[in-house]
Amino acid sequence: MADTETIWIIGASDGIGEALAQEWAWRGARLILSARSAEKLEALAAQLGPEHRAVPLDVSDRDSLAAAAETVAKAGPVDRVVQLAAMYDPGKIAELDPETAAQIVTVNLTGSFHIARLAPKLLRAGGQLALCGSVAGYIGLPQGQIYSATKAGVISLAESLRAELAGELDVRLICPGFVDTRLTQRNDFTMPAMVSPQTAAEAIIDGLNTRRFEVHFPRRLTWAMKLLSVLPYWAALPLTGRLT
């Protein structure tokens, strides 16, 4: 990567995205910050310094995507694109509003597709595209069925693109465990191995600077979930039922 990287972070207004922006800015990167909240983005960009730019974006809106892509393209080739935008609404399936469920699919999965489709036009040759899955995508979790399904889809999307774009782009997958954000604060169950957004940001940046396809953390949780996902269903599903 270049000495001074240009990095586009989507989902930068809070949580992991905001922590990533702060950590990358501290490490000397030049940032393009996107999310739906223009006010939060402008405040973050002002806090980080004049070399960073806020570009509001709704990944579920094609006009917004086109406008943001045009703005990013004017900044010149980007070194990394990191897609973190996500929605989450925990609860039993009978309680989940169908329109909310559809929006979760649109933001988490279709939004990742839209960003992946734009990335080759905006990244420099060999640049990095990172999509955010989750340990919830390793195996379906109770009361997170739509979220788990979308994150499983993002994992498959990243795997497909890693093979499809080999030699053109460096496609990566980020799979966090439980991170203390507005999304996880909605859960009403014990979340093991919880980490702070700052810890998550450091793990992501350090992982993306290696050659590994998947960046997953904290390992004591992610390896356990990976093991659970390869067990036969008769063994795995009773165990997942105990997770919430």
What do these predicted regions represent?
Residues A116, T150:
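Active-site helix of classical SDR
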